[in-house]
């Protein structure tokens, strides 16, 4: 179980503006949870809910 959610890892959960679910997929907003990208990365803002700042963001690869 993800300590911050009610779902099992890999399962589905709902998320608000800031994502606390690290191992779950957000279904209510149809976006995945990921680290925030550096300024200038448009991809991350479109497909993710930020859960924390990071210089390495898989959404932007």
Curated annotation (Swiss-Prot):
Quote the record's binding site residues for a divalent metal cation 2: 7, 13, 15, 26
**GO CC terms, sorted:** cytoplasm; nucleus
Point out residues bearing the modification Phosphoserine: 58
Among InterPro entries, the record links this protein to: Metalthion_dom_sf (IPR017854), Metalthion_dom_sf_vert (IPR023587), Metalthion_vert (IPR000006), Metalthion_vert_metal_BS (IPR018064)
Q: Where is this region: Alpha?
A: 30-61
Q: Which PROSITE patterns match?
A: METALLOTHIONEIN_VRT (PS00203)
Q: Does the keyword Nucleotide-binding apply?
A: no
A Pfam match:
Metallothio
Q: Which residues bind a divalent metal cation 7?
A: 50, 57, 59-60
Q: Which GO terms describe its biological process?
A: cellular response to cadmium ion; cellular response to copper ion; cellular response to erythropoietin; cellular response to zinc ion; detoxification of copper ion; intracellular zinc ion homeostasis; negative regulation of growth
The family database entries (Gene3D superfamilies) matched by this protein are listed as: Metallothionein Isoform II
Cite the GO molecular-function annotations of the record. metal ion binding; zinc ion binding
- Record keywords, A-Z: Acetylation, Metal-binding, Metal-thiolate cluster, Phosphoprotein
Entry coiled-coil feature ranges: none
Q: Which residues carry this modification: N-acetylmethionine?
A: 1
Query: For a divalent metal cation 1, which residues are the binding ones?
Result: 5, 7, 21, 24
Question: Binding of a divalent metal cation 4: at which residues?
Answer: 33-34, 44, 48
- Relay the domain remarks: Class I metallothioneins contain 2 metal-binding domains: four divalent ions are chelated within cluster A of the alpha domain and are coordinated via cysteinyl thiolate bridges to 11 cysteine ligands. Cluster B, the corresponding region within the beta domain, can ligate three divalent ions to 9 cysteines.
Task: Give the record's family classification.
Answer: Belongs to the metallothionein superfamily. Type 1 family.
Q: Provide the assembly information.
A: Interacts with EOLA1.
- What name does UniProt use for this protein? Metallothionein-2A
Name of the coding gene: MT2A
